[in-house]
From Swiss-Prot:
Protein name from the UniProt record: Phospholipase B-like protein G
EC number: 3.1.1.-
PANTHER family for this protein: PHOSPHOLIPASE B-LIKE PROTEIN G, PHOSPHOLIPASE B-RELATED
Signal sequence annotation: 1-24
Localization terms from the record: Secreted
Glycosylated residues, chain numbering: N50, N98, N173, N341, N368, N450, N480, N526, N576
Organism field: Dictyostelium discoideum
EC top class named in words: hydrolase
Biological role: Probable phospholipase.
Gene Ontology CC annotation, any one: extracellular region
Family, per entry: Belongs to the phospholipase B-like family.
Gene for this chain: plbG
GO biological process: phosphatidylethanolamine catabolic process; phosphatidylinositol catabolic process; phospholipid catabolic process
Gene Ontology molecular-function annotations: phospholipase activity
Main location: secreted
Amino acid sequence: MIKSYYLFFIILIFLIFINNFILCENNNNNKYNNNNNYPFINVDKIIYTNSSNSIYLVWSNEQFNLILQSSYNEEFDDIVMIGEYFDKIETTGWGELNITFNSNSATIQISDNEQAYFTGFIESVLTGERINQMYNNFAASEFTNSDHTPSPKLIDFLNTQMEFVRDQVFENNGSSQYWYSTGLIMSQFDGLVNGYQQSPFPQLSEIQLYILTSAGDLETLVTLFPSSSSSSSSTTNENKNKNIKISSIKPNFKDELTDCSGFIRILPDYSDVYFGHTTWRYYYALLRIYKFINLQFNFQDTPMEYKVSFSSSPGFISSKDDFYITGNKLAIMETTNNIYNESLYQYTIPQSVLVWQRAMIANMIATNSSDWVKIFSEFNSGTYQNQWMVFDYKLFIPNKQQSSSSLPPNTFWIAEQIPGQVKTADLTNILNEQGYWKSYNIPYFESIYNISGYSEKTDLPPSYQYSYEKCPRSLIFSRNASDVLNFEDMKSLMQFNNYKTDPLSYSSPLNSISSRGDLLTIENGNRSAVAFGGVDSKITSFNQVLTLSCTAISGPSTNGGTLPPFTWSQSPLFQNITHIGVPETFNFDWQEMGPYPN
């Protein structure tokens, strides 16, 4: 009897061990996103046949169904999410995407992760064809080997980074708002993947879609891990953290001027503050979607409303431009800086959070400017080095002569990132003193400027190109700032390119607020034309921020009609550039984005 008891006890212990082992394995699978953890969504296939759609995600017949609004049956369908996509890229240069959670859903409880997952799923179903076009354009230009695929080392870096993020979410999302929010961003990405893979369009893998949505970070990573050895020189440095070979890339066209122009203007009568951004990029990426997301989360029983509008592109969960307006009345943008000191890349490690993720996490959590830059600074990936600008419109009262007619402290913060460091500061006093803030791809902080290697570049011709105070855009912004007295003036400034007669442009279409690399000639730029330059402008103001709205234009600048519109057929140089789905000619007008419910 005793022996039988011991035998029973041993068998019981063994069964408990096996059960715990299985649970452990299941948990490990869960943290890496076993897709079975998300609800199945039945998609009405007719959605894929229309370029513009209004759809509902409904709970009916004991399952989630994605249907056209016209198919909605009030008696049987409980609306969970609303999605709208209007593809006007051929007529205005923009698609418009609006995804909203219905908090009044009556028959089923929706978790935060499901909300986020549904958001990504709906986006990829509505924009799947554009996502496929965007990825093919991106891969054809960014991956220079014969089959246009990323290098194995790049894939390894991103897989390791994604694993790190999912690990941290799994271990900390119950106690940390940061990792809870990160988990929601990753659930949105999972929805994007699953929604796209359920579509009839040519398949893209999870890592391909992760590469696409990480396009900003890849500006650094494709340099560190080139897909073709022909793009790198013979010198390399060792990354001490992961034994990564860093290619010493000779500065190419884009390295010289990087991305974007930003400008903030306080009107002299204190009636408004304009917040404007002009994106610079290669023209193959001129597939633009303005997005609005309206979700309602809870962290530890505390409401965490997530409302954000932003300029973006197909397959991007973030902006990448970057330009955001949040429900907390924050306006956020960035311009990109270079790294000329390659030793800094030892701090570019996969055990980190990518820039696109950190920006969206900060958008989700931050209620003021100082919080935004603080949250963004955590888990620095050392990729996509930017100057971030955050303006808190809650602290601006139009026409009210506040003490000394100035913005209060903490209204305007900036953050400048390099590998291994993010420097932040409240620069409201500078904005008050100047009446404006200018940003143009050169670090503001002297310490960041020096350690990045800019100071050594000033000895190279043209020396002005690397000077914070003397580069063309700095001088143009300072000269033209006082001319901005109304919204039309601001629109003109953000599209400004008068290179033919402006002495500050040195006769080059690159040297202005919205550059036109396609207008380069041997005479004016000592190089051939290239399909790169300013591709849009977005401007918001006090009243627009209240409804997460802005005014935007898509396409290379015509400077109010004095420059020819860009067209792909204007040069044989552009004919071999893959630009699927991109309009042939860009001659669009300004568009109103919003208002969106706030």
